[in-house]
């Protein structure tokens, strides 16, 4: 029997669902199987097992006869580890189930390598990727209020000029970093002063991955378009709002 963390019989409220429900939530079958196998059985301190290891090591006689507790956090952790471990080709196939096809995207490897480090489910993986690929339709109000200041427009325009001069070299993270770090030092900026307004302009929020990665994935034309849009529209409106509040 599987109990909830309080020791009572597991119900749907606690996480007891149909297998397809887990699929729809973005869990990989290997992670779910690993989780179920470990509920009443162990092999020392090992937590993660390949299918081959499960077949080789699992012994029904070693199953614990007492009730086991459902731990949703453990399942999420296992799923995140499997997402990091499986091939990018496999992740591309999993994402198709959620209507995202990266098969022919020129930066699919970079997108997946970056996003799978943060995702606990395939649903989260999709969101992390689309946050980068989709042009933002709104901007995080709290982030704009905190990081967009009166001088933000000036140094973002300077930074855009720098990117344009080096636009042929923005194809990898190392080049973007090499171009950006001297700019930050020369203009007396702190990293959040530059990076957080850029994150907001490019993705709509402040919790996106590294700015270097995003720029290398999107390329100059898309980065320029999104930054210019943010400067002309949202950031200016925010300054007006703040001035009206003063």
Spans of model-derived segments:
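Alpha-helical recognition segments enriched in aromatics with Gly/Pro capping
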Residues: 1-82, 196-202, 206, 229-230
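Short, mixed-charge aromatic SLiMs
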Residues: 5-8, 56-64, 102, 139-144, ...
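Amphipathic alpha-helical segments within well-ordered protein domains
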Residues: 19-20, 33, 76-79, 96, ...
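Hard-cation-handling environments
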Residues: 85
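Small-residue-rich helix-loop
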Residues: 88-187
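Charged substrate- and nucleic-acid-binding regions of tRNA-handling and nucleotidyl-transfer enzymes
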Residues: 171-234, 242
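Eukaryotic N-terminal low-complexity, Ser/Thr- and Lys/Arg-rich leader segments
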Residues: 239-246
């Amino acid at each position: 029997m599987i109990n909830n963390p309080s020791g009572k019989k597991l119900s749907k409220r606690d996480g007891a669902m149909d297998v397809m429900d887990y699929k729809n939530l973005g869990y990989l079958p290997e992670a779910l199987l690993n989780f179920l196998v470990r509920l009443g059985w162990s092999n020392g301190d090992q937590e993660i097992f390949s299918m081959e290891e499960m077949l080789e090591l699992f012994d029904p006689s070693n199953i614990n006869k007492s009730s086991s507790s459902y731990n949703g956090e453990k399942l999420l952790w296992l799923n995140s580890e499997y997402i990091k471990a499986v091939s990018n080709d496999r992740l591309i196939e999993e994402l198709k189930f959620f209507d995202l096809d990266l098969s022919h995207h020129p930066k699919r490897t970079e997108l997946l390598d970056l996003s799978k480090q943060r995702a606990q489910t395939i649903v989260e993986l999709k969101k992390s990727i689309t946050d980068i690929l989709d042009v933002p339709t709104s901007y995080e109000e709290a982030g704009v209020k905190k990081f967009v200041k009166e001088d933000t427009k000036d140094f973002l325009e300077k930074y855009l000029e720098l990117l344009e001069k080096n636009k042929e070299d923005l194809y990898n993270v190392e080049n973007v970093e090499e171009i950006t770090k001297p700019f930050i030092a020369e203009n007396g900026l702190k990293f959040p002063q530059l990076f957080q307004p850029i994150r907001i302009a490019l993705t709509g929020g402040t919790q996106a991955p590294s700015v270097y990665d995003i720029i290398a994935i999107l390329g100059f034309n898309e980065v320029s378009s999104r930054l210019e849009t943010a400067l002309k529209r949202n950031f200016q409106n925010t300054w007006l709002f703040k001035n009206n509040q003063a």
